Regions:
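A conserved hydrophobic secondary-structure block that centers on an alpha-helix together
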Residues: 1-2
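Exposed, low-structure sequence patches enriched in small/polar residues
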Residues: 53-236
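Outer-membrane beta-barrel translocator/channel fold
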Residues: 7-58, 62-81, 161-166
Length: 236
């Protein structure tokens, strides 16, 4: 929905696919579950709402999303609902996220931006200065810049750094959620893959891109990536 040229609101809701554990985690299922079917543990829906503000030299967007076990939850199906407020009323049984981007841009020169994704954050750790070591601080961030190269046809050079903190995109398995009497996995994934950035948790990336449009139907691009990945921490 775009009531004004500078304002746009987006909303999506749907069901997520569950992964096939037969090739991802062999013998993962406990023997006493009574069912060795993926749908026994993965019954999730996904909802997202986002606001975009786009001006001549400034772009801002922010929003929230939620992974929630399959049930009738009107608050997650209504476009203008506040997901955080709704979960506080129905119980802490869902996986909430918040995100935002700020970009400064100047036509003919380039742009700079900062992005933040909050999967979970303990505000008390900000005062203790251990936000980067506390296991329940699960977030990702990116900052970068793009430069328009003069005297070359539609040529740009961009540099960005991305960091995915450990446990980001993961979530503790919740037992006895509404309508379920067993553990349900609510990771930020679809069909076993992250819904967010393509990096795995506990990774960072430095990326350099060069793009040039020589002709109408000819684009040339070159990319350099330096990716580091740390220890894979287990999650429930």
């Amino acid at each position: 929905i775009s009531p004004f040229k500078f304002l746009r609101y987006s909303f999506i809701v749907g069901s997520l696919e569950y992964p096939s554990q037969s090739y991802m985690n062999e013998k993962w299922y406990p023997e006493n579950t009574g069912s060795n079917d993926d749908s026994f543990f993965f019954q999730n829906n996904y909802t997202l709402n986002m606001v975009d503000l786009d001006f001549k030299h400034l772009h801002i967007d922010f929003g929230s999303s939620v992974i929630w076990p399959n049930r009738f939850a009107m608050g997650y199906m209504f476009p203008l609902a506040n997901f955080v407020e709704y979960q506080n009323h129905v119980g802490d049984a869902d996986n909430l996220q918040m995100f935002g981007d700020i970009k400064l841009k100047y036509q003919g020169l380039g742009e700079i931006w900062v992005s933040l994704f909050l999967d979970e954050l303990d505000l008390s750790t900000l005062l203790k200065k251990d936000v980067f070591t506390y296991t329940r601080d699960m977030f990702a961030y990116q900052f970068g810049a793009k430069y328009v190269i003069p005297k070359l046809p539609f040529a740009t050079l961009s540099l960005r750094y991305t960091k995915i903190e450990p446990y980001c995109y993961t979530h503790q398995s919740i037992n006895y959620t509404p309508w379920f009497n067993h553990y349900i996995s609510q990771n930020y994934t679809n069909d076993g893959y992250n819904i967010g950035y393509y990096l795995d948790p506990n990774s960072d990336e430095l990326r350099l891109d060069f793009n040039i449009k020589q002709k109408k139907n000819l684009n040339l691009a070159s990319t350099y990536q330096f990716i580091r990945h740390g220890t894979d921490y287990e999650s429930q």
